[in-house]
Design a protein with these regions (language model features):
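4′-phosphopantetheine-dependent carrier domains
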Residues: 1-184
């Protein structure tokens, strides 16, 4: 079967990606920053293996991926991590792997990717999620149709949300800044 590494598994994009990956039969690996977040994922996704959850705060996830895949690497990476964690994520890809970058930090910083990565015939793609709003109507309609189909089939389900009243906007920003939130704020 195919495998995927999804970084920041308890964020909104990460949670949705894990759900979709399982629905399509992928072997899922993910990263989180705390044991609390790891436990949250294990409760939410009983099919997720504890040993497939790595640390998003350093590059130790690379060793975990290579051990768990017996040196093969994963078929897909959904990346939102930066700097040395970006480079480690690239190294996690197997032959002809596909890398999907959704973080802006390294793009805006013009971080270099070594050409040796392409010896494994890798594919790199970037998605600027905020630019989807200005995408052509044909693309937005196609995405909407795909999402509607996955909602009807039960693949896509509502995400965990933390809603704050307007009077607690400061607390909401503090939660976001702390990195302790799970799901959408």
């Amino acid at each position: 079967g195919k495998s995927i590494l999804i970084h920041s598994g308890t964020g909104g994009v990460g949670l949705a990606a894990i759900r979709v990956a399982f629905a399509y039969g992928l072997d899922v690996f993910t990263t989180v920053s705390t044991d609390e977040k790891k436990n949250f994922l294990l409760q939410l996704f009983p099919q997720l293996k504890a040993e497939n959850i790595g640390n998003s705060r350093d590059t130790t996830f690379e060793k975990m991926i290579m051990e768990r895949t017996r040196g093969k690497g994963v078929d897909f990476v959904l990346n939102s991590l930066a700097e040395e964690k970006l480079q480690a994520s690239i190294r996690c890809l197997g032959h002809r792997g596909k890398f999907l970058e959704i973080g802006k930090f390294d793009m805006e910083k013009d971080t270099k990717i070594g050409m040796s990565a392409f010896l494994k015939e890798l594919s790199f793609h970037s998605v600027m999620l905020d630019k989807l709003f200005s995408a052509p109507d044909s693309m937005k309609n196609l995405l909407k149709k795909m999402i509607d189909n996955d909602i009807k089939s039960g693949i896509i389900k509502p995400l965990k949300t933390n809603v704050f009243p307007a009077t607690q906007v400061e607390q909401a920003f503090r939660l976001l800044a702390s990195g302790r939130h799970m799901g959408k704020v």
